[in-house]
């Protein structure tokens, strides 16, 4: 079945490109998730007036790749114990999270996070929440690292 999941882990450019490099993923786009204001802009998000998180909407076929595999991949490139920071990206918009529009799916995600907690001495800070809203980011953010291969990325994509 074709499904969508929303992931956050620092700057959305890197997370999007990381999953775009995976042949099992159908498509991605980047946006602002769970904003307190309608139609936020990048400037709004950076000025801390939205409480939105930079996120990637990931479309996948659960017969090809499981949600648990997607979460395992995310945890390979984030520090889930860090609060509002990934690499050089600092701010609430850079928090880590896994978001769904399905409350039953949230329970499965939380179970997976509880299992992964055994691998960490510090508490996992990754949010697990329902999607309240999701606004596409500006076009120049979409597939940014494909358009700008030498652009900034907090993930070492060459090592992946």
Swiss-Prot record:
Catalytic residues identified in the record = 11
Q: Where are the transmembrane segments?
A: none
Can you tell which superkingdom this protein's organism belongs to? Bacteria
Q: Name one GO cellular component term.
A: cytoplasm
Q: Which GO terms describe its biological process?
A: cellular response to oxidative stress; protein modification process
**First-level EC class:** oxidoreductase
Q: Does the keyword Lipid biosynthesis apply?
A: no
Asked if the Swiss-Prot or TrEMBL record annotates the protein with the keyword Secreted, the reply is no
The molecular function terms of the Gene Ontology recorded here are: L-methionine-(S)-S-oxide reductase activity; peptide-methionine (S)-S-oxide reductase activity
Known EC number: 1.8.4.11
UniProt keyword annotations, A-Z? Oxidoreductase
* Reaction it catalyzes: L-methionyl-[protein] + [thioredoxin]-disulfide + H2O = L-methionyl-(S)-S-oxide-[protein] + [thioredoxin]-dithiol; [thioredoxin]-disulfide + L-methionine + H2O = L-methionine (S)-S-oxide + [thioredoxin]-dithiol
The job of this chain, per UniProt, is described as: Has an important function as a repair enzyme for proteins that have been inactivated by oxidation. Catalyzes the reversible oxidation-reduction of methionine sulfoxide in proteins to methionine.
What protein family is recorded? Belongs to the MsrA Met sulfoxide reductase family.
User: Protein name, please?
Assistant: Peptide methionine sulfoxide reductase MsrA
């Amino acid at each position: 079945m074709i499904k969508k999941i929303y992931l956050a882990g620092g700057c959305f450019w890197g997370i999007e490109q990381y999953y775009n490099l995976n042949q099992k993923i159908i498509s991605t786009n980047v946006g602002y998730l769970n904003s307190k204001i309608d139609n936020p802009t990048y400037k709004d998000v950076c000025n801390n007036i939205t409480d939105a998180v930079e996120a990637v909407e990931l479309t996948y076929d659960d017969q090809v790749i499981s949600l648990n595999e997607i979460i395992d991949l995310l945890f390979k490139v984030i520090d889930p114990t860090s609060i509002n920071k990934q690499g050089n990206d600092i701010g609430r918009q850079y928090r880590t999270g896994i978001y769904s529009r399905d409350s039953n799916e949230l329970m499965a995600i939380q179970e997976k996070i509880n299992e992964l907690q055994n691998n960490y001495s510090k508490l996992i800070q990754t949010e697990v929440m329902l999607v309240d809203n999701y606004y596409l980011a500006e076009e120049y953010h979409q597939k940014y690292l494909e358009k700008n291969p030498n652009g900034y990325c907090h993930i070492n994509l060459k090592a992946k």
